[in-house]
Amino acid sequence: MKYELQTTDGRARRGRLIFERGVVETPAFMPVGTYGTVKGMTPEEVKDTGAQILLGNTFHLWLRPGQEIMKLHGDLHDFMQWHGPILTDSGGFQVFSLGDIRKITEQGVHFRNPINGDSIFLSPEKSMEIQHDLGSDIVMIFDECTPYPADWDYAKRSMEMSLRWAKRSRQRFDELENKNALFGIIQGSVYEDLRDVSVKGLVDIGFDGYAVGGLAVGEPKEDMHRILEHVCPQIPEDKPRYLMGVGKPEDLVEGVRRGVDMFDCVMPTRNARNGHLFVTDGVVKIRNAKYKDDVSPLDEHCDCYTCRNYSRAYLHHLDRCNEILGARLNTIHNLRYYQRLMAGLRQAIEEGKLEHFVVDFYQRIGKPIPPLAEKDVAAGN
């Protein structure tokens, strides 16, 4: 993988990630394909929304179908018939979300298989091996996703263990002679001094890109913005920056304003299945009775298959009848909305008009613009 930074506007960056399997224009949003599928969508449909890269889930694919089944097909690309780049998370977030059925040690995490109750062990080394078999174009290190809230002492211990695990991940990745990219994950909760130690430690080890982890886990938005403003300038300029698990459309806009290149989240697909649809002027809750006789398209500004062919009344009808087609059409639209948003951000950065884009975006959805830190405002001048 190679990253090319093309231009900037303030802290925002316009670039591209170059893989053997294709080019990803950044800033980019990655749809989530937890089990080797973006729920309800064929790979061709996902590609038609403008998606350039997908996220797969190491933990879930390890449990089902398992490494051996994957290798029978070749790798995850062959298994799911997506031939563009794939990023896989390390499994850390899922393991640490298991709560009482897992035990953390220096070596890794012991836990009960949530499917059949078997005792399983996942370590940095094992995570690298699974992701190698998946053929991931971007491999994520195995780390502890520090919960929120966490006091400073706990966050420090967690971050320091994640750094030790980062070294072990790097070593095993290299031993496997994996020619793809390996990203480090910056931890430290909401504490700037701990984030500083994490960034420096990861840069000293050396990675192909750097993710900001441990955000979007319940902390106030102001803390997320503050940490991004503090951390992003410390990441080497020639390496991509990835904000994990984020998020709402406005979170993507704010991440881009602060220098983030990559995002992922289940929100557009999960919300689609619940009838919560993102449009240019905000949100349409399609199961609301007021849409039962609305013959207008979902979003007159959108060029997706759903908006070109169907009315709000039809989508409302499908939702009320629990028809599978409704979830599919909603998902097509929400994913296209996210990709159109990212394309708009990329164009605005290219033209040096990002803040004009931001003003228009917030006016349309009827929300105030979160302030940038003074140093970030200065960077835009």
From Swiss-Prot:
User: What does the UniProt cofactor note say?
Assistant: Binds 1 zinc ion per subunit.
**What is the top-level taxon of the source organism?**
Bacteria
| Gene Ontology CC annotations of this record | cytosol
Tell me the SUPFAM superfamilies matching this sequence.
Answer: tRNA-guanine transglycosylase
Identify which cofactors the protein needs according to its UniProt entry.
Zn(2+)
Q: What keyword terms does UniProt attach to this protein?
A: Glycosyltransferase, Metal-binding, Queuosine biosynthesis, Transferase, tRNA processing, Zinc
One of the GO BP terms on file: tRNA-guanine transglycosylation
Q: Which catalytic reaction applies to this protein?
A: 7-aminomethyl-7-carbaguanine + guanosine(34) in tRNA = 7-aminomethyl-7-carbaguanosine(34) in tRNA + guanine
Q: Which residues of this protein are catalytic? A: D89 (proton acceptor), D264 (nucleophile)
Annotated InterPro entries: ArchSynthase1/Queuine_TRR (IPR050076), TGT (IPR004803), TGT-like_sf (IPR036511), tRNA_ribo_trans-like (IPR002616)
Spans through the membrane: none
| EC number of the protein | 2.4.2.29
Amino acids binding Zn(2+):
C302, C304, C307, H333
Q: Where is this region: RNA binding?
A: 245-251, 269-273
Q: Which sequence ranges form a coiled-coil region, renumbered to this chain?
A: none
Ligand binding (substrate): D89, S90, G91, G92, F93, D143, Q187, G214
This protein's pathway reads:
tRNA modification; tRNA-queuosine biosynthesis
Provide a Gene Ontology MF annotation, just one. Answer: metal ion binding
What's a Pfam family in this record? TGT
What does the similarity note say? Belongs to the queuine tRNA-ribosyltransferase family.
Assembly and oligomerization: Homodimer. Within each dimer, one monomer is responsible for RNA recognition and catalysis, while the other monomer binds to the replacement base PreQ1.
Q: Sum up the protein's function in the record's words.
A: Catalyzes the base-exchange of a guanine (G) residue with the queuine precursor 7-aminomethyl-7-deazaguanine (PreQ1) at position 34 (anticodon wobble position) in tRNAs with GU(N) anticodons (tRNA-Asp, -Asn, -His and -Tyr). Catalysis occurs through a double-displacement mechanism. The nucleophile active site attacks the C1' of nucleotide 34 to detach the guanine base from the RNA, forming a covalent enzyme-RNA intermediate. The proton acceptor active site deprotonates the incoming PreQ1, allowing a nucleophilic attack on the C1' of the ribose to form the product.
Q: PANTHER family from the xrefs?
A: QUEUINE TRNA-RIBOSYLTRANSFERASE (PTHR46499:SF1)
Protein known as: Queuine tRNA-ribosyltransferase
